[in-house]
């Protein structure tokens, strides 16, 4: 089995090294095409205004000056001579749950793999933020991901569907199994931090305030809170079929779809 790895934290990220170790428990044909620098929060964006610079680090290991989406496209269409059987994106430093999925470059790696017709999974590891530092328990995903992936790889997923896996912030032995979940809802409470440079010109940072949400049973955020691995099926089709008829009636048309 041939596996392509990517991420959004960059080629030197600890989570990518963890993902490679995970992938090598499944196959000895593992390829990496990952961003040269941190691409967090760039979602499913393409580089259309700048050239893509590809750097070979070692056999089957490449860094690309581009987004996670660029990396998957280049991996499948340029770097690899044979299409991969599986795309794994991650392991992200921090969970990708609830509304995170709309911003996440990690999720985008799995989205692009799916669009390229390859079975794809996104993996993220929740962490503790303490005294201004991230404490990421990588051993959780490394312990539990291999067996989980072996089970999920044989699934007959519908076309356009991929899986979003999130591992809880706890010790490996404290993980209370895996749960199939739905996407939850979190308020980001994004804030704008206004500053001035040395010449008095303004510049800004976006930052997260305290995040709040309803930890409803069955959601990804509820699963993580209860030390469960969250497995959420996501799909490329963003159509809200529940309101198509109402929109059609508002426009004076008959029932649609």
Swiss-Prot record:
Family of the protein in this entry: Belongs to the SurE nucleotidase family.
The molecule here is called: 5'-nucleotidase SurE
Any one annotated GO CC term: cytoplasm
Q: Which Pfam families match?
A: SurE (PF01975)
**Cofactors named for this entry:** a divalent metal cation
UniProt source species: Rhizobium leguminosarum bv. trifolii (strain WSM2304)
- Enzymatic reactions: a ribonucleoside 5'-phosphate + H2O = a ribonucleoside + phosphate
Query: What is its biological role?
Result: Nucleotidase that shows phosphatase activity on nucleoside 5'-monophosphates.
Q: Which UniProt keywords apply?
A: Cytoplasm, Hydrolase, Metal-binding, Nucleotide-binding
Main localization of the protein described in the UniProt heading: cytoplasm
Any single GO molecular-function term of the entry would be: 5'-nucleotidase activity
Upper lineage is: Bacteria, Pseudomonadati, Pseudomonadota, Alphaproteobacteria, Hyphomicrobiales
Does Isomerase appear among the keywords?
no
């Amino acid at each position: 089995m041939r596996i392509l790895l990517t991420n959004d934290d960059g080629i030197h990220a600890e989570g990518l090294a963890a993902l490679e170790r995970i992938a090598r428990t499944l196959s000895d044909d593992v390829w990496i095409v990952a961003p040269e620098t941190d691409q967090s929060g760039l979602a499913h964006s393409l580089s259309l205004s700048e050239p893509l610079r590809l750097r070979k680090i070692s056999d089957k290991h490449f860094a690309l000056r581009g987004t996670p989406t660029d990396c998957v496209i280049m991996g499948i269409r340029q770097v690899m001579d044979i299409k991969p059987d599986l795309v794994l994106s991650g392991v992200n430093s921090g969970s990708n749950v609830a509304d995170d999925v709309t911003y996440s470059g990690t999720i985008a790696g799995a989205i692009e793999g799916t669009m390229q017709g390859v079975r794809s999974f996104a993996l993220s590891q929740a962490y503790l933020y303490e005294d201004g530092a991230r404490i990421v328990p990588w051993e959780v995903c490394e312990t539990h991901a291999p067996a989980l992936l072996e089970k999920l790889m044989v699934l007959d997923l519908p076309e356009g569907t991929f899986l979003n896996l999130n591992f809880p912030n706890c010790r490996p032995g404290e993980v209370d199994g895996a749960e199939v979940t739905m996407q939850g809802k979190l308020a980001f409470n994004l804030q704008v931090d206004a500053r001035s440079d040395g010449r008095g010109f303004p510049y800004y940072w976006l930052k997260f305030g305290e995040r709040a949400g309803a930890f409803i049973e069955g959601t990804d955020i509820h699963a993580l809170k209860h030390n469960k691995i969250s497995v959420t099926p996501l799909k490329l089709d963003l159509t809200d079929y529940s309101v198509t008829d109402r929109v059609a009636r508002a426009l004076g048309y008959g029932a649609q779809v």
